[in-house]
């Protein structure tokens, strides 16, 4: 009886792993900044810090994913502010939203993380930053949920700078 349950469990684990198209990496703000610098000269970057428990984050999330899929000069990077013990929940949500590639979950204390992402960020979620394609510098940032039109304006500016 134990062997069939083991095989069933292993099959489920392999199936779940095969369905996952996102690499969720627990890391600190310094490593995230280093990752973002790789896109300078190649793509504009939209960095979105969110959490599964944040209603405005969850509301705007599908729109951000859609923009990332639509606009080829844009790299969308998601950073979860959830706690380490929510790793499974975060990965499941990212897979539900069909996020691919690399996403991050913070693994440093809140204040160090906030200061490392942006010195003018007060910690409210969602938090969004746009980095210029050419310059690689921060051009625009905001706290809170915003409209698709505001995102599109910021993306266009980031692609051109």
What are these regions (language model features)?
Residues 49-66:
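Conserved redox-active cysteine motifs that mediate thiol-disulfide chemistry
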